[in-house]
């Protein structure tokens, strides 16, 4: 039985694709799955830099037929395996995105779960991972441009036979922002990740700051994806989320004790 391939995509840069791949990957490793995270952002790879890990061989070298995928496997935080990318323009020029198919097939035969972290835009190298996925996860912020780009990515995924199973909203603080995403992206909302000042600077949050609302949200997402792997429908999972933010008297009482904002009430 081959592993499940999740492609993390979104169109716009800076929405939290890499952060999501890292945190949900570590969370699922912690849940007992053997996980590998692939930095397929061929133009601006940043996974290794974000995690501050050293590596000997990059994915770019494999795609340029100068190394084997086994040479790239690097130990990451929380026990996950990382396939790092390279940042030089020369490496980008030599890498052939079409060879990513063989790489992902090899990894899916060796791991329970493969997370593909993709680049921004709708270029060829950003499109290839969409067609290789068993499931595509869209990541967006409440920003209207990001929402629009996520929608375009979903359309592109459909053209290359990629199945988008849901959307992950980052940096949301109000119900109105959730409504905008659900209207702008025609796919179920699987998770809401609150803004966290430690994100992108002290990753992974689920290891370094496990008690934060953001870390809890990533674990919540990992649980949802685990249910997907076990055959539950996304609609069933999403229907159980009656509200992403607390409301009414409970919220007012929390606000009296903590004036730091509604996102701290996520998933309570």
Set out the residue ranges of the language-model regions.
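Haloarchaeal acidic low-complexity proteome signature biased toward cell-envelope/secretome components but also
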Residues: 1-33, 43, 53, 62, ...
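Short coil/turn connectors at secondary-structure junctions
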Residues: 2-4, 31-34, 77-79, 110-111, ...
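Hydrophobic/aromatic beta-strand patches that form the interior of the parallel beta-sheet core
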Residues: 6, 38, 81-83, 137, ...
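P-loop/Walker-type NTP enzyme "switch/lid" segment
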Residues: 10, 40-109, 201-204
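Short, conserved catalytic or interaction motifs in soluble domains
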Residues: 10, 17, 40, 135, ...
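Helical mechanochemical/support elements of P-loop NTPase systems and associated helical scaffolds
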Residues: 43, 55, 65, 96-100, ...
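Conserved catalytic-core segment of NTP-binding enzymes
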Residues: 109, 113-201
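C-terminal lobe/tail of nucleotide-utilizing enzymes
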Residues: 159-268
């Amino acid at each position: 039985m081959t592993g499940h391939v999740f492609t993390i995509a979104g169109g716009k840069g800076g929405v939290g694709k890499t952060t999501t791949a890292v945190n949900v990957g570590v969370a699922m490793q912690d849940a007992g799955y053997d996980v590998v995270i692939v930095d397929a952002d061929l133009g601006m790879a940043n996974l290794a830099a974000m995690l501050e890990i050293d590596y000997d061989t990059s994915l770019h070298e494999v795609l340029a037929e100068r190394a084997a995928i086994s040479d790239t496997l690097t130990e990451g935080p929380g026990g996950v395996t990382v396939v790092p990318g390279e940042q030089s323009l020369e490496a980008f020029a030599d890498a052939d995105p079409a060879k990513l198919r063989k790489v992902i097939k090899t990894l899916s035969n060796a791991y329970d779960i493969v997370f593909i972290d993709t680049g921004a835009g709708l270029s060829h190298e950003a499109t290839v991972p969409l067609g290789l996925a068993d499931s595509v996860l869209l990541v967006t912020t409440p920003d209207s441009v990001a929402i629009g780009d996520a929608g375009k990515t979903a359309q592109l995924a459909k053209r290359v036979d990629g199945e988008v199973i849901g959307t992950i909203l980052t940096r949301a603080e109000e119900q109105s922002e959730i409504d905008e995403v659900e209207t702008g992206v025609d796919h179920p909302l699987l998770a809401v990740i609150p803004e966290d000042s430690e994100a992108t600077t002290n990753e992974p949050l689920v290891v370094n700051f496990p008690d934060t609302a953001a870390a809890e949200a990533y674990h919540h997402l990992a649980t949802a994806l685990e249910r997907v792997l076990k055959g539950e429908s996304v609609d069933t999972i999403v229907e159980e989320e009656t509200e992403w933010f607390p409301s009414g008297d409970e919220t007012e009482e929390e606000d009296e004790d903590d004036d730091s904002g509604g996102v701290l009430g996520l998933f309570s």
